[in-house]
UniProtKB/Swiss-Prot annotation:
Transmembrane segments: none annotated. Disruption phenotype: Strain cannot grow on L-alanine as a sole carbon source. Disruption of ald causes a sporulation defect, most likely in stage V. This is Alanine dehydrogenase. Its EC number is 1.4.1.1. GO terms for biological process: alanine catabolic process; L-alanine catabolic process; sporulation resulting in formation of a cellular spore. NAD(+) binds at residues 132, 176-177, 196, 218, 237-238, 265-268, 297-300. It catalyses: L-alanine + NAD(+) + H2O = pyruvate + NH4(+) + NADH + H(+). SUPFAM superfamilies: Formate/glycerate dehydrogenase catalytic domain-like, NAD(P)-binding Rossmann-fold domains. Homohexamer. Trimer of dimer.
Length: 378
C-alpha cells in the first residue's frame, strides 16, 4: 500500500503522523511511504531521517494525498478537502461531532475515514490515550502560567507558600485527561477537587491520590459550588465521538473570581463551558469574559510535538500496519477495535454518536463496507 504523510497546516501544529521509526516499520512490511517535505521538522525530524528510513520525500502535497491511505494528526482543514476522493483511507483525529462541514465533505466524497479518537478496545481508547495524557498534564501547567498576573490571571501561585493558602483547582471529568491533570496539579501543590458522574471512578481516584484530592459526584449544585471556588477550572469530559455536554453555565462563570482561569480540554469536541464560544490558537491562546481567562486551544499537544509525535506513533503504527497489510475492508472486518474507529465510508456516517449529533442517518460499518470497491486497499 502507498501511505502518505502530509505536513500539518493547523495553526502551530508541529506534530507529524509518523516518526522515521514508524516509517521504517511500514516499509519493512513492503509498503511505500510518501512524506511531504518538512512534515517532521516541527517535531525535530529532518527530511534526511525519513529518507534513511526508506520514505520518499515529496514536495507536492497533492501527490502525498494521492496515496491510498493518508495518515495525519489533526482533522483536515477546508483547504485540504479538495484532496478528498472515493477510495481514500484517512487515518487521523477527526472529532466530527464538532466539525459538521468536515463530516459533510467526507460523506460527499465517499472517504473511508477512521478516527483515532473512536478506535476502542473494550472501555479504552488506545489511540486517544497518549494525547489525553499529554493534554491533561499540560492543562495544569498552562493553567498555572495563566494565573500569573502578567498573563491576565489573579496572581495566584498554585503551591502557595508557608502562611499562604494553596490555589484551588477544580477538574471536571475523572478520565485520562482529568487524572493526568490531577497528577500535575497535586505535584504543583494545589488544592485539587475532581468531579465525575461515576462513583466507582471516584473511588478509584481516591485510591490513587488518597488525601491529596477531594472528590465530588457530578451534579449542577456540586459543579456550581466547585467552579465558584476554583482559581483554575480544568474541563476534561469526554463522550467518545459525541459533542461534549454543556456542564458549566455562563452564570457559573460569572460567579468565579476575577482573574480565575478556565482550561477547556474538551474544546475539540465542542467544550463543556457555555462561555467557551470559540476555539483559540497557540498564537492567541486566551480571551477574557466576565473577568475570567479562557484557554480553548484544540491542539494542546501540538505545543510539545516531540513528545506527542513519538507517543502517537507508538500506538497508531500497529493499526496502520493492519490496514496496509490486509487492505481497509478486511482490516476493518477483522478488528472490532479498528472498526469502532470508522466514522464515514462509501457516503455513509458509520459512527452512531456523530450521526446523532449532526442529524445524519446512522449506517453500521458492516453495511457501509459491503461495497468493497469503494474502499482503498480492497
Amino acid at each position: 500500500m502507498i501511505i502518505g504523510v502530509p505536513k500539518e497546516i493547523k495553526n502551530n501544529e508541529n506534530r507529524v503522523a509518523l516518526t522515521p521509526g514508524g516509517v521504517s516499520q511500514l516499509i519493512s512490511n513492503g509498503h511505500r511511504v510518501l512524506v511531504e517535505t518538512g512534515a517532521g521538522l516541527g517535531s525535530g525530524f529532518e527530511n534526511e531521517a525519513y529518507e534513511s528510513a526508506g520514505a520518499e520525500i515529496i514536495a507536492d502535497p497533492k501527490q502525498v494525498w494521492d496515496a491510498e491511505m493518508v495518515m495525519k494528526v489533526k482533522e483536515p482543514l477546508p483547504e485540504e478537502y479538495v484532496y478528498f476522493r472515493k477510495g481514500l483511507v484517512l487515518f487521523t483525529y477527526l472529532h466530527l461531532a464538532a466539525e459538521p462541514e468536515l463530516a459533510q465533505a467526507l460523506k460527499d466524497k465517499g472517504v473511508t475515514a477512521i478516527a483515532y479518537e473512536t478506535v476502542s478496545e473494550g472501555r479504552t481508547l488506545p489511540l486517544l490515550t497518549p494525547m489525553s495524557e499529554v493534554a491533561g498534564r499540560m492543562a495544569a501547567q498552562i493553567g498555572a502560567q495563566f494565573l500569573e498576573k502578567p498573563k491576565g490571571g489573579k496572581g495566584i501561585l498554585l503551591a502557595g507558600v508557608p502562611g499562604v493558602s494553596r490555589g484551588k483547582v477544580t477538574i471536571i471529568g475523572g478520565g485520562v485527561v482529568g487524572t493526568n491533570a490531577a497528577k500535575m496539579a497535586v505535584g504543583l501543590g494545589a488544592d485539587v477537587t475532581i468531579i465525575d458522574l461515576n462513583a466507582d471512578r471516584l473511588r478509584q481516584l481516591d485510591d490513587i491520590f488518597g488525601h491529596q484530592i477531594k472528590t465530588l459526584i457530578s451534579n449542577p449544585v456540586n459543579i456550581a459550588d466547585a467552579v465558584a471556588e476554583a482559581d483554575l477550572l480544568i474541563c476534561a469530559v469526554l463522550i467518545p465521538g459525541a459533542k461534549a455536554p454543556t456542564l458549566v453555565t455562563e452564570e457559573m462563570v460569572k460567579q468565579m473570581k476575577p482573574g480565575s482561569v478556565i482550561v477547556d480540554v474538551a474544546i475539540d469536541q465542542g467544550g463543556i463551558v457555555e462561555t467557551v464560544d470559540h476555539i483559540t490558537t497557540h498564537d492567541q491562546p486566551t480571551y477574557e469574559k466576565h473577568g475570567v481567562v479562557h484557554y480553548a486551544v484544540a491542539n494542546m499537544p501540538g505545543a510539545v510535538p516531540r513528545t506527542s509525535t513519538i507517543a502517537l506513533t507508538n500506538v497508531t503504527v500497529p493499526y496502520a500496519l493492519q490496514i496496509a497489510n490486509k487492505g481497509a475492508v478486511k482490516a476493518l472486518a477483522d478488528n472490532t477495535a479498528l472498526r469502532a474507529g470508522l466514522n464515514t465510508a462509501n457516503g455513509h456516517v458509520t459512527y452512531e454518536a456523530v450521526a446523532r449529533d449532526l442529524g445524519y442517518e446512522y449506517v453500521p460499518a458492516e453495511k457501509a463496507l459491503q461495497d468493497e470497491s469503494s474502499v482503498a486497499g480492497a
